[in-house]
Amino acid sequence: MRTSQYLLSTLKETPANAEVISHQLMLRAGLVRNLASGLYTWLPTGLRVLKKVEQIVREEMQRAGGNEILMPMVQPADLWQESGRLDDYGPELLRINDRHKRPFVLGPTHEEVVTKLVANELSSYKQLPLNVFQIQSKFRDEIRPRFGVMRGREFLMKDAYSFHLEDECLEKTYQIMFDAYCRIFERLELNFRPVLADTGSIGGEKSHEFHVLADSGEDDIAFSDASDFAANIEKAEALAPAGERAEPTQTLTKVATPNVKSMDDLVQCLSVDLKTTVKTLLVVGATVEGEAETVVALVLRGDHQLNEIKAEHLPQVATPITFASEEQILAAANCNAGSIGPVGLNIEVIVDRSAAHLSDFVCGANEDDAHLTGVNWQRDCNEISVHDIRNVVAGDPSPCGQGNIEIKRGIEVGHIFQLGRKYAEAMNCAVLNEGGKNQTLTMGCYGIGVSRIVAAAIEQNHDKYGIKWPKAIAPFQVAIVPMNMAKSARVKETAEALYESLNQAGIEVLFDDRKERPGVMFADHELMGTPLLLIIGERNLDAQQIELKNRITGEKSLIAIDEVMSLFN
């Protein structure tokens, strides 16, 4: 490809609205352009990268036994009503009507469509197991699209679905797909971690996320410093402290705490360690339809944070988790939110394991501007239940029993689930088993954010000059950069001959035939991340040599013209 025929849209300045480095470089290097909030046009350079990622994903899915299909992006809302997700999915699901006022949705995922397809196409256990996949655009109406294609509203995704008669067969396919995902990210040369994960709105029984480690990641990943254990912080279990709870040594005392509005204020006011305090949060309780709304108290150690996902899994807590209103707080505790405590509460009290291990602790007195010291669970509080409801923190013992927890940021680029029979039961997806009876199928689903991988790769592979692509997904393998070609027939002749040879050999080459200053040309290629530059200058041609520059290492060397082709053998 010649730059004179190529849409090379580089920018010198960083756009003001680009927050993370991948978004900045994708705009500056001319990979994408923003159309509207969360919507991007892929320009030629970006599309070349995207297609290479897509092809690696496709190859590994086929190697894992996947059959490629393509399903409609627009889906009948009736399917989502049938699965029970139409109302549950929330405002991220874009709903539309056709000219006949029939309701449709713009697909954020395709469980319903593929389940209906398989229910209609399969009739016998002899057709199982089946694994199908597609690579297609999805749409999720994110409330705050950000970070460029990392969290856009429209994005390219590979979603695969497997169907099985028995759970044992699902487990085997799940492991095959897990291994395929690892191969994909290894081929992409990404530093990644597979981690245990929550199943979220898709549902299911077992789940792993695949995270590319990067400081710009939106997820916290907890992993052991002594084993292979890794989990999303939403999923990582916080173990109960070792040993027995200490016996009480203090008497229960109420103390004045005027103007205390936060845990930090409390620590300063009473000169206590935050680890010896507890905080009490009131949330809406789970109720049966028609019953009055209730509230539930969640109690954590003062230095710990509530894990909302864990709390939502408790049967006593409404889903999605909703914090109590001021009116509900006053009715339940007779004080403002900053003074709530577990002593004397006449509602259900759920205490985190670490908080339950405390003795002689400090808590709110359920009275404005007052707290209690010397509090002990068995002596001073009504009945409580103890659960793991907090986020793990660095230094916690790993739940695997080996080492301690470390925390790093990650960008989620893949997610696999064992869905079980949730969708198949709802949509009557069954086949005749060996005994001639109808048997509901069990499912797995497996997603990869193809467009997000491009951004994640940049987050891990860049320097102050631009992108440093992994070889497998670089837009071009090499660029020819002739110096002052317009003034030197010899430079032009050498560049043209080299371009022709590389093209004939199937090498992806970008011939920079612009009438530009060398500095501008070098800056553009460094920004775009072209792995190798072949720099042709009049002086080196006297010795039948050209300069070779490696974008990854920064090394420069002279190479004989007739040795150039050997670089790609």
Swiss-Prot record:
- Record Pfam families: HGTP_anticodon, tRNA-synt_2b, tRNA_edit
**Where, subcellularly, is it found?**
Cytoplasm
Q: Which PROSITE patterns match?
A: AA_TRNA_LIGASE_II (PS50862)
Question: Molecular function terms in GO for this entry?
Answer: aminoacyl-tRNA deacylase activity; ATP binding; proline-tRNA ligase activity
Q: Which InterPro entries match?
A: aa-tRNA-synt_IIb, aa-tRNA-synth_II, aa-tRNA-synth_II/BPL/LPL, Anticodon-bd, Anticodon-bd_dom_sf, Pro-tRNA-ligase_IIa, Pro-tRNA-synth_IIa_bac-type, Pro-tRNA-Synthase_IIa_type1
The UniProt entry's GO biological process terms, in alphabetical order, are: prolyl-tRNA aminoacylation
Q: Which UniProt keywords apply?
A: Aminoacyl-tRNA synthetase, ATP-binding, Cytoplasm, Ligase, Nucleotide-binding, Protein biosynthesis
Q: Chief location of this protein?
A: cytoplasm
**Top-tier EC class:** ligase
CDD domains, per database record: ProRS-INS, ProRS_anticodon_short, ProRS_core_prok
Q: Give a Gene Ontology cellular component term annotated to this protein.
A: cytosol
Identify the EC number(s).
Answer: 6.1.1.15
Q: Does the keyword Cell inner membrane apply?
A: no
Q: Which reaction(s) are listed as its catalytic activity?
A: tRNA(Pro) + L-proline + ATP = L-prolyl-tRNA(Pro) + AMP + diphosphate
User: Does the keyword Oxidoreductase belong to this entry?
Assistant: no
- NCBIfam families per the record? PRK09194.1, proS_fam_II
Its domain comment says: Consists of three domains: the N-terminal catalytic domain, the editing domain and the C-terminal anticodon-binding domain.
Subunit structure as annotated in this protein's UniProt entry: Homodimer.
Q: Which family does it belong to?
A: Belongs to the class-II aminoacyl-tRNA synthetase family. ProS type 1 subfamily.
User: Per its database record, what is this protein's job?
Assistant: Catalyzes the attachment of proline to tRNA(Pro) in a two-step reaction: proline is first activated by ATP to form Pro-AMP and then transferred to the acceptor end of tRNA(Pro). As ProRS can inadvertently accommodate and process non-cognate amino acids such as alanine and cysteine, to avoid such errors it has two additional distinct editing activities against alanine. One activity is designated as 'pretransfer' editing and involves the tRNA(Pro)-independent hydrolysis of activated Ala-AMP.
The name of this protein is Proline--tRNA ligase
Report the gene name: proS
